[in-house]
């Protein structure tokens, strides 16, 4: 795996840490250490899945990215490409101009939304429980939930 992909994955883990810090749940050193270790584990597990190619990727997603790459990127959105929603096709058009492998960019995009989902659930739990430990538990339960992890890191679904 390209070092740039590893750095992008680490940046997503860093974003998760910043979100936890800004939510005020990392005020105790023990919480910071625990969160850092759990984030490292969550993102290492995701990193181990990144090389896996699904038939959805090989038969559709990479074909669509190649279409965008050869037909002018965003300009190709005028043509009928794929059967996904327009925002996701726009993302595919945007990454078509990158020199990074599209498999990893697609999965990193999905992993980004794992963090958004975990943060959102943490915020929801915070409406009912004020204690940081409950919020952290909600965040990490979502981040480690098998379907969440497999959907993004292994299957590349958003």
Task: Write out the residue ranges for each language-model feature.
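Membrane-interface micro-motifs in multi-pass membrane enzymes
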Residues: 1-7, 85, 149-158
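Loop-to-helix entry region of an early transmembrane alpha helix in multi-pass inner-membrane enzymes
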Residues: 2-9, 86, 100-119
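Transmembrane signal-anchor helices characteristic of membrane glycosylation enzymes that use polyprenol
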Residues: 4-59, 111, 144-146, 150
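Transmembrane-helix motifs of polytopic, lipid-linked glycan transferases
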Residues: 15-20, 105-129
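Membrane-water interface at transmembrane helix exits
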Residues: 20, 24, 45, 49-50, ...
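Membrane-helix interface segments
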Residues: 30-31, 104, 130-137
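Membrane-embedded helix bundles of polyisoprenyl
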Residues: 42, 134-158
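Short hydrophobic/aromatic helix or loop-helix immediately within or flanking a transmembrane segment
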Residues: 60-70, 75-105
